[in-house]
Amino acid sequence: MMRENRIRRAMEIPRTLKLADGTAVAYRVSSAEARRPGRVLVLLHGLASNLTRWSEFVEHSSLTARWDLIRVDLRGHGGSPARGLLTLEAWADDIAAILDREGHAHAVLVGHSLGAQVALAFAGRYPDRAAGLVLIDPLFRGALGGRSAWIARLAPLFRAAAGIARAGNALGFGRKTLPALDLRELDREARKALASAASTEAFIRHYSSPRADLRYFHTAHYLQEMAEMFRRTPPLERIRAPVLLLLSRGGTFADPVLTQRVAAQFNDAEIVMIDAEHWPLTERPVEVRRAVAEWCARRKLR
């Protein structure tokens, strides 16, 4: 199995797409053994994250035999440095450009947290190109609670603060370089520690800590993303693509019961509950891979 994983990593090809505005978006492509245009999963990470969040998924997924897998460093993240405003619309347009380059008219988008919001924005902006959506702990405005609801209400202040930070960057203030963040290794260490209630609380504090995120992420981008993450989604009843929702029972940022009620607005949705807090790719990676593969097979998205 270890040898097989090394082979899969070797077969994954890193690519960069230079966009019209000068931004270079980095992504990696794992081509299926039986490749077919349109049979592709685009994997989208969360806030202040990067494509290494999906390393284990790509290495171990049973989908690699029949599906292309594309994991993206959203602009402003990881290997896709960017200046200026980060928006859901810009990320959606970047994904469309990547699909064009790779020869796919449509795709199944798999997004975690902020990545789920990007997937929804893509489906709203490019309805004919969204063949399906897998939303891992999406953040619907009607289901937010606690700190998340507070952040959503203060979104205009976060946007204003982000603008001030960008102005400072333009004047030469701010960090020029950031250390690399390998989430695959971070996730491995986290799983070793997740053995008690106390360690679970420590895990939540660390994985939701702005201080920890800002070690690896620009302040202006972080403030802007805090506003983007809690924007209202496109009308869910207008999304024609089938949807799979993977919801954490812990409900760290959103109430899972309220999330299910909001999700009832989709025309065609299935829900799978997972014993996790908000990071099932870290906490329950095997369950996530199984749920996605079974859904793709059951819905005949192949």
Locate predicted features:
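Short glycine-enriched nucleophile-adjacent loop
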Residues: 116-127, 133
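Residue in the alpha/beta-hydrolase core beta-strand immediately N-terminal to the catalytic nucleophile
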Residues: 108, 131-134
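Catalytic histidine neighborhood in serine/cysteine hydrolases
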Residues: 265-278
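Flexible "cap/lid" loop of the alpha/beta hydrolase fold
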Residues: 124, 133-173
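Catalytic histidine-centered segment of alpha/beta-hydrolase-like enzymes
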Residues: 276-289
